[in-house]
């Protein structure tokens, strides 16, 4: 990237890196650290035409969320304005956008893919 003076870096964080979560201090801290590091690197590499951004998913339909008890899942879903879990495709489409030339003037940002659960 440095040699070509062009690049796109997209890191995956989590809604928990912005909100915290009971029993997940270590996870929340590591996801928040990715965001802070990405902002610093975005400043450092902007003049080299390298953009660095984050995608921060909320609750996404996956093997992990499939294990959540339905009553708990209903409570979580009720806290999402779009009233549903996201999909892996929602996340991958966001990564594809940030990796494209359409996002050439976006750097140091975090795009939240969470159905409106967190608007920060």
PLM ranges: what are they?
Residues 54, 76-102, 106, 115:
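C-terminal helical subdomain
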């Amino acid at each position: 990237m440095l040699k070509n003076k062009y690049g796109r870096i997209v890191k995956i964080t989590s809604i928990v890196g912005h909100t915290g979560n009971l029993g997940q201090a270590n996870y929340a801290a590591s996801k928040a650290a990715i965001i802070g590091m990405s902002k610093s690197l975005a400043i450092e590499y902007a003049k080299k035409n390298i953009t660095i951004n984050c995608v921060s998913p909320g609750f996404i339909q996956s093997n992990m969320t499939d294990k959540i008890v339905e009553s708990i899942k209903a409570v979580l879903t009720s806290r999402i304005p779009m009233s549903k879990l996201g999909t892996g495709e929602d996340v991958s489409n966001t990564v594809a956008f940030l990796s494209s030339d359409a996002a050439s003037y976006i750097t140091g940002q975090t795009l939240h893919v969470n159905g409106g659960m967190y608007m920060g």
